[in-house]
Amino acid sequence: IELINEDFSVDIGKDILLPINYLGTGIISIVYLIIYMLNSGNGILLVDELENGIYYKKFADLIRTLDSLSHELNVQLFITTHSNDFIRNLDGFSELSLYRLNPKFDGGVMQWDRTKIMQYIDDKSADIR
């Protein structure tokens, strides 16, 4: 990524740099997220529906990258989602806890540990929403 005339451009392996806005809103969101992570070292970052604009087959790669970067920068991520596809890729995070808001549950919040989440991921018919 390079700053050219006050705009970010990205090297995509071709002979020219493309302005970042040519790459779509999903990529732009990820670039901003990485910038926010760089500025949030030793802190927390709240991310709403990270999966929006990202091709679902790339969720696992994205999660592994964010997990690695979050450890490197010591940033704790809190991510909201309504996407089963995204949840099914959460095993890429080395440390993981999932919270589900449910007014019928005592206290209104259900907490799932890694074991419970992996059981959910294995049940292809499950829907957490």
Predicted regions: what is each one?
Residues 1-2, 79:
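A generic structural-conservation signal
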Residues 2-3, 100:
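Structural signal for conserved beta-strand scaffold positions within catalytic alpha/beta enzyme cores
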Residues 4-39, 44-57:
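Conserved ABC ATPase signature
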Residues 60, 64-129:
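C-terminal lobe/lid and adjacent interdomain/linker elements of RecA-like ASCE P-loop ATPase modules
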